[in-house]
């Protein structure tokens, strides 16, 4: 395990003073205790903060809502999964036998959670500056590729214009589910781009918010290199 972790640490650009933190970050709950669930919680907050700083410093012309949408697209499961794949993070995960047999090392949710846990482990190992350096290193290519003109548009508008530019039919939005009590409902909407066989699911406290998230996820798929 130590040799494999050396490779991962080189990819992260961070050498752990306490390698046990990194091992815990890579340990799924199916493997046993201690696992990475608590680290994932902390890493999510650290990632949101670092990405917010990066967007604030790089895009002085963007408004709060525009930066919030961009941050959401970068720190969502899809964004985390992309970074985790670049790190070959699945190769380093410690999973229970059943989870390993079912392909858990490829599952986007497990990879995304583990990456957030790695960010937390870096923070606990050497502080916020170290965690920020790792996140900046991994996320800079995606942030550098952002077009501020496109970012200023809401996701549904941006997706519509992108498809029109490619001479493709417009997307459709289908209400899939409504969860919760009347005073605290969560809406689930599916965005379908049938010409590309693309389906994404967004969630929000109202239908419009769910549609916007679904469109944002579709955009992220279409903008992949």
From Swiss-Prot:
NCBIfam families, per database record: RNaseIII
Catalytic residues (UniProt): 44, 116
Name the record gives this protein: Ribonuclease 3
Pfam families: dsrm, Ribonucleas_3_3
Transmembrane intervals: none
Single GO MF annotation: double-stranded RNA binding
Cofactor(s) demanded: Mg(2+)
InterPro entries in alphabetical order: dsRBD_dom (IPR014720), RNase_III (IPR011907), RNase_III_dom (IPR000999), RNase_III_sf (IPR036389)
Gene responsible for this protein: rnc
GO BP of this protein: mRNA processing; regulation of gene expression; rRNA processing; tRNA processing
Principal localisation: cytoplasm
């Amino acid at each position: 395990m130590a040799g494999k972790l050396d490779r991962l640490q080189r990819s992260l650009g961070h050498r752990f003073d306490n390698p046990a933190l990194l091992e815990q970050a890579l340990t799924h709950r199916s493997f046993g205790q201690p696992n990475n669930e608590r680290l994932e919680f902390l890493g999510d907050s650290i990632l949101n903060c670092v990405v917010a700083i990066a967007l604030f410093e790089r895009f002085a012309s963007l408004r709060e809502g525009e930066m919030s949408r961009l941050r959401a697209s970068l720190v969502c499961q899809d964004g985390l999964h992309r970074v985790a794949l670049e790190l070959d993070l699945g190769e380093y995960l410690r999973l229970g036998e059943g989870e390993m047999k079912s392909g858990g090392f490829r599952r986007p949710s497990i990879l995304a959670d583990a990456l957030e846990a790695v960010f937390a482990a870096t923070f606990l190992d050497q502080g916020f500056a170290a965690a920020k350096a790792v996140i900046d290193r991994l996320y800079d290519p995606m942030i550098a590729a952002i077009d501020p003109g496109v970012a200023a548009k809401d996701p549904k508008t941006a997706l519509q214009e992108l498809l029109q530019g490619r001479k493709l039919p417009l997307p459709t939005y289908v209400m899939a589910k409504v969860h919760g009590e009347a005073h605290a409902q969560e809406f689930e909407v599916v965005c379908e781009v049938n010409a590309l066989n693309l389906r994404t699911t967004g969630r929000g406290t109202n239908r419009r918010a769910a549609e916007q998230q679904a469109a944002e996820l579709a955009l992220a798929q279409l903008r992949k290199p």
